[in-house]
Amino acid sequence: SMEFGSRGTTESIADMNPDDIESISVMTGAAAAALYGSDAANGAMLITTKKGKAGATQIQVSSNTEFMNPLRLPDFQTRYGTGRKGKASGSTIHSWGAPLNQAARYNYSPEDFLQTGHILTNSVTLSGGTEKNQIYFSTAAVNSKGLVPNNKYNRYNFTFRNTSNLLNDRLTLDVSGSYIIQKDRNMINQGVYSNPLVSAYLFPRGDDFSLVKAFERWNPARKIYEQFWPQGEGGDLRMQNPYWIAYRNPRENSRKRYMFTGGITYKITDWMNVAGRIRVDNTNSLYTEKLYATSNPTLLENSKKGKYTETRGEERQTYGDVMLNLSKTFKEKFSLDAHIGASIKDNRFDELSVYGPIAGAPNIFNVVNLDKSQKKTPKTGWHEQTQSFFYSLELGWKSQLFVTTTGRNDWASQLANSPQKSFFYPSVGVSWLPSSTFNFPEKFNYLKIRASWASVANPFPRELTIATHPYDDTISGWDDKSNYPIGQLYPERTKTWELGFDARFLHGFTLSASWYRADTYNQT
């Protein structure tokens, strides 16, 4: 929610070591959907990773250091002091009190809360091999400290790739593996309650910020440190001392991810080959959130001793395909590029959380120290599988006129118990290169005119067509009531017409423009 925010972790693409990337390209339109399924209905980003090169072994070492400071912050008023409606108040988060004279101004800026961040990146790569076998290995470490106090990010990458050419170069084996360890603390999210920037930005201009830097005070009666924040919670904002949020409401993620990719290609003729691939991508994660005693009561569920959350997740992604590829030119006029294949995608996710207020000794963060009567143990999980058949066919004439058609049929598990067990999405396109037909000037050397029609489908969300029984934490069991299945659901479909052109001119400038119309049906 907007109030509580999220865990603030990174996207999976951020796990990659930039030094392992050879190139990045973008595939758009129906071609992306035909080869990669409905997940690529809006396009696909293709990342090609490096592999070994024949020749002497090469070792590259790189080190990079970056420092970070905010480029610009919002402008804040410093004319009015602590209070509301022009009246001074001694304990409030508002800064619209009585006007301040120059001597009473502390000249506070949110930049006083921020710190200079840095990113240290170190990597080592090794590459080499023979004409028949090439290897590539890399390791990298990213260690970062953010702008917000107690914000850290550490990632360690290990990558290996081996490419072999066998049977007189007719058989190619390509195997790679990656292992990624990531640990982060207090990644900033968009919520209010767990975001220290809210109270740092709204700190009253008539108060002395240096006083709240000592964010906790020792309570000899309770024998614990308590939060110091005389400004109050600001009503529904539930604000706390920003340093208390950073150091006494820590959120930590620990992820271990390993990926394996294996590919085999057999060249039947010079213009035909068959290829198979398998990719496994597994992630184990641990998320913890520690809320110390005297944090905001709303977050603590009115506990006087603190609250603890521990979530363990497991994600399993498996993909495999087999494809027949043809690329041939006939009589130096006609060309044929075709891909025919089948694929399977299997995704699984399981997550178990344990959270609740602390019942025993304050600020001892362990699941055995939680209040048994209020402890929650929600478990979530799902399993999806899509089996597909696809093709892509392009006919060319003199490398200037092309007709393309694609098609894909998906059997998705989300369609269980629905009237339609699979869905087919085709496309047709025509493109012409006037720059190849006519003699264009050197300064305007490329022009492509294109037109296409495509019909792309997506399955509806899982579990809509089957009865489900939600887990009820209040009774520590399954609810007798079930979510009634929706029977008459059909896959979402978008039909698109597109006209456009691509041009290159003046030795490096490119221009692309498109007109399109898209109509979507069966939205859920």
Q: Where is each model-derived feature located?
A:
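Short acidic/polar hinge/loop motifs at secondary-structure boundaries
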Residues: M2-T28
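Short, glycine-/polar-rich solvent-exposed loops and beta-turns at beta-strand/coil boundaries
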Residues: P18, Y36-A41, N151-N154, E442-N445
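A beta-strand signature from Gram-negative outer-membrane beta-barrel systems
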Residues: P18-Q60, I119-T121, V142-K145
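A generic beta-sheet turn/junction motif
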Residues: A40, G128-K132, A141, S164-N168, ...
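Surface-exposed loop/interface segments of Gram-negative outer-membrane beta-barrel transport/assembly proteins
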Residues: A54-Y106, L147, N151, N157, ...
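Outer-membrane beta-barrel "beta-signal"
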Residues: S427-S431
